A protein has these predicted regions:
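C-terminal catalytic/acceptor-binding lobe
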Residues: 189-303
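Active-site-proximal specificity loops/subdomain of glycosyltransferases
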Residues: 20-26, 58-127
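The conserved acidic donor/metal-binding loop of glycosyltransferases
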Residues: 132-136
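A solvent-exposed, charged loop/short amphipathic helix patch at secondary-structure junctions
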Residues: 4-32
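Conserved catalytic core of nucleotide-sugar-dependent glycosyltransferases
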Residues: 99-121, 138-218
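Short loop/turn segments at strand-loop or loop-helix junctions that form parts
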Residues: 9-20, 58-59, 86-90, 160, ...
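Short, acidic, metal-binding catalytic loop of nucleotide-sugar glycosyltransferases
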Residues: 28, 39-51, 73-78
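Hydrophobic targeting segments
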Residues: 7-12, 24, 44, 52-58
Length: 303
């Protein structure tokens, strides 16, 4: 039987996701790009299977952002194949009511996929792997994903366990989530992937926790990912309840991070003060000042 042709995207939703309308200012963006370059890119360069494209997604507003332009130019100097789109977030955003979220996703897919069609080319299937901008995959992950999705009985695949790393200190521990983590891949027929309504109908996933509710989901009970913490995460911190036993830093060789070093980010007085508080208090303050106050002011300015 002839092997099916695939296009494999590792999709990084850089802006458009989370608090503050998905963009927390240029200082945040500079720091996140630093994390991306120092940790995520080495892990991608270390992949044993090179047949993939890094798809970096942005809001339309970032098309002319000098930090985004610099990152795009820098990536073009690396061996990685990459493409940037500016159509917004290309999976379900559960901050909105279902009808609004579905409409926004359809629009974002339409705007983004039109820039992917030439890159996709003449293939049978498109694989879409979620690649967060501050987390990493093991160096055999792409090969493992592609091999697993040759099976006809599954159309999605993910890893159930991983590691968690404090990028600032270099500490690494096991990471044992009790729900499906956001490290999964969906296998689309090309014709379905490129049509927004069919795309959404095929994979109506409102959260990574529910992938198995909608797709024939295969999982690997191995530690295939590394969650990175750096002090600017929205929901994950090093002493998370899912954190397990400490592990030796030798494990970083499995992720291409043996030479990554530790992360040095400038910390404002406001953040120093915030970090003195319990994490739950920090999240509540971010929500109140970010979502309830700044976002309303931002929307007022745009109206």
């Amino acid at each position: 039987m002839e092997e099916k042709k695939i296009k494999h995207f590792l999709y990084t939703p850089f802006t458009g996701l989370g608090l503050y309308g998905g963009f927390r200012g240029n200082r945040w963006l500079r720091n996140r790009i630093k994390v991306f370059k120092q940790f995520v890119i080495p892990s991608l360069l270390a992949q044993t299977e090179k047949n993939f494209t890094l798809w970096v997604g942005w809001r339309p507003e970032e098309r002319s952002n000098p930090h985004v332009i610099e990152l795009k130019n820098w990536l073009e100097t690396t061996p990685l194949k990459s493409i940037f789109t500016y159509g917004g977030l290309c999976f379900w955003d559960d901050k909105f009511p279902d009808d609004v979220a579905k409409s926004r996703l359809a629009t974002n897919l339409h705007l983004s996929i039109r820039d992917l069609v030439d890159e996709i080319g003449d293939v049978d299937y498109v694989l879409m792997t979620i690649q967060p901008s501050d987390d990493c995959y093991a160096s055999n992950a792409v090969a493992t994903i592609q091999d697993a999705l040759k099976r006809e009985d599954i159309n999605a695949f993910g890893f159930t366990k991983g590691y968690i790393m404090n990028y600032a200190t270099g500490e690494v521990s096991e990471y044992n989530p009790n729900t499906n983590p956001p490290f999964y891949t969906i296998k689309f027929k090309k014709s379905v992937f490129i049509e927004p309504q069919e795309h959404i109908q095929f994979a109506p996933i409102k959260s990574h926790e529910y992938v198995a509710n909608h797709l024939r989901y295969g999982v690997l009970d191995e530690r295939g990912f590394l969650v990175g913490t750096h002090g600017e995460n929205v929901s994950t911190y090093y002493n998370h309840p899912f954190k397990g036993n400490w592990v030796d830093k030798e494990i970083l060789w499995n992720f291409g991070l043996q030479n990554a070093g530790t992360l040095k980010l400038p910390i404002s007085l406001r953040k120093r003060f915030m970090r003195m508080m319990p994490y739950r208090v920090q999240r509540k303050l971010r929500y109140w000042f970010g979502e309830l106050i700044w976002n309303r002011f931002y929307e007022y300015l745009r109206s």
